[in-house]
Amino acid sequence: MKTILLLTVSLLMTTMAAVNAQKQPAEFHGATPTKAHYQVVYQLNTDDDGKIKGTLRNIQNALDDPRLKGKLDVELVVHGAGVSVYRTDKPYEELVKGLQSRGVILAMCENTMRERKIDKKELFPFISYVPSGNGELIIRQQEGWAIMHP
C-alpha cells in the first residue's frame, strides 16, 4: 500500500513540475555566435516566383540578423530554372541589386546558359559567372561554407 501511495505521489509531483515548466517563458534566444566570420551559399534552381522571393528574403534576413552583422559572406548560386532571377525581362532586378550592394556574390552557372541557349545580354550586366553551379557548391562546401537550399 505504501508503495502505491509513494508511486502516486511521485507521479503527481512529476506531472505538476512538467505543467509548471510549460508555463514559464522560454529562455532560449537562438544560438550564440562563437566565430569571427561565417559563410553561406544559397542555391536557387527554380523559376517559382514564391521560392525566388523567399530565397531572396532569406538572404536579406541572414544579412539583417544582429548576431551575424559584419560577420557574414553570402553567395547566391543560380542554375537550371533559377536563371529567371537574373533575367532582364523578370521583375527581380531591384531585389538582386539590393543584395549585391550589401556584398552578396551573384553567380550564374555557365552550363545552364549553354544548355538553355541563354546569351549574357539576356541577363543583368552586374552578375558573375561560374563554369558549373554544382561545381561552385561543391567547392564552397569543401571550403566550409554552409549550403542553403530554401
Stretches with model-predicted labels:
Residues D73-Y86:
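Acidic helix-start/capping segments at beta-turn-to-alpha-helix junctions
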Residues L7-T15:
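Bacterial N-terminal signal peptides
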Residues K23-D73:
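N-terminal secretory signal peptides
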Residues D47, H79-G82, N111:
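Solvent-exposed coil/turn segments that connect beta secondary-structure elements
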Residues A17-A21:
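Sec/Tat signal peptide C-region and signal peptidase I cleavage site
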Residues V40-Q43, E75-V78, I105-M108, H149:
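Structural recognition of the beta-strand scaffold that forms the well-ordered cores
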Residues M1-I4:
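Positively charged n-region of N-terminal signal peptides that target proteins for export
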Residues R87-P150:
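A cross-taxonomic marker for long C-terminal extensions/tails that follow the last structured domain
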